[in-house]
A protein has these predicted regions:
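Glycine-rich adenosyl-nucleotide cofactor-binding module
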Residues: 46-90
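A short, structural micro-pattern
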Residues: 12, 29, 68, 115-116
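Acidic, metal-coordinating catalytic segment for phosphate/diphosphate chemistry
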Residues: 2-44, 58
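Long hydrophobic alpha-helical segments typical of transmembrane helices together
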Residues: 155-178
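A short, polar/proline- and glycine-enriched secondary-structure boundary/capping micro-motif
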Residues: 32-37, 61-66, 142-145
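Residues embedded in well-ordered beta-strands
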Residues: 34-36, 49-51, 121
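Unchanged
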Residues: 33, 72-163
Length: 178
């Protein structure tokens, strides 16, 4: 894909055209991670909460009471140049939540047919871990995001594709479903 022609670019994105004439979007950093943080939520060993990051998305973003509408997502972020997906997942979790974790792989998916991005999915159980203060990356969009714990099944009703994929993959792991 490095030989594909750049039609338009900014410091954040490029629109490219392949030798077959297919045009697609490539964002700086290209690939991304989505991380699901879980904690036990009661006596039942099969009861979990999931940390949801409410953040800005580029679509359907009306202001509500003078504030941008936020959408439920897992912890997400782009891979830095030369960074592994696992290292990016650990870094993003610390930046956005303050948790220091080791992550477990959950799979990956192609984000869409009009972009060349792969999203790597991870999860970590943070039951009993006390987080440090979230570092954030200094951007306005990250500063308006917020984290909230919800029952695990909350993921099923989130519209963000990583939430849907994560819900079904995690349900298999956590509840030993086939």
């Amino acid at each position: 894909m490095d030989t594909d022609r750049v039609i338009f670019s900014t410091q954040w994105i490029a629109v490219r055209e392949s030798s077959q004439g297919f045009q697609y979007l490539e964002r700086n950093g290209k690939d991304s991670v989505a991380v699901f943080l879980l904690r036990k939520s009661g006596e039942n060993p099969a009861q979990y909460d999931v940390l949801i990051r409410h953040q800005h998305l580029c679509i359907d973003n009306q202001e509500v009471n003078g504030r941008l509408k936020l959408f439920p997502c897992p912890i997400t972020g782009a891979l830095d140049e030369g960074e592994s997906s696992e290292a990016a997942a650990i870094r993003e979790v610390f930046e956005e939540t303050g948790y220091r974790v080791q992550v477990l792989p959950l799979g990956k998916y192609v984000v869409g047919t009009q972009v060349n991005e792969v999203c790597y999915l991870y999860y970590a159980n943070v039951t009993g871990i006390v987080p440090d203060e979230a570092q954030e990356d200094g951007t306005y969009l990250e500063s308006i995001g917020r984290n909230e714990w919800h029952p695990f099944n909350y993921l099923e009703m989130c519209e963000y594709s990583a939430c849907q994929i994560g819900f079904f993959k995690l349900r298999k792991i956590l509840f030993q479903e086939s």
